[in-house]
């Protein structure tokens, strides 16, 4: 009888430990998935805000019949991405400047790097030409 009680206690302990481990794994997995959903939602919200902002800039330029203007490199990237058609992989944007640093090159197959997003565009930021490759 003593052996059966000991076996039952040991078995109960093993089962309880297994359930606790599974519960913790499930919590960790759920937490990981939840964070992934939050990140995806934040990225979608940011993309929507960027799209609205670029639409506003482009409509304003179209209305005034002026060249597209960009304040930051991120604005340039989003304008080029919006104007690109087909299977375009790279774009070179020339700014009206007549200076040595009036070209910006973008790889449209990848998102813009974080360290380039807030760089100010030279001169007034008017786009002279865009060449796609």
From Swiss-Prot:
Keywords: Secreted, Signal, Virulence. GO terms for biological process: symbiont-mediated suppression of host signal transduction pathway via antagonism of host cell surface receptor. It comes from the Bacteria. InterPro entries: FLIPR, FLIPR/CHIP_sf, FLIPR/CHIPS. Its main location: secreted. The keyword Secreted applies. This is FPRL1 inhibitory protein. The gene is flr.
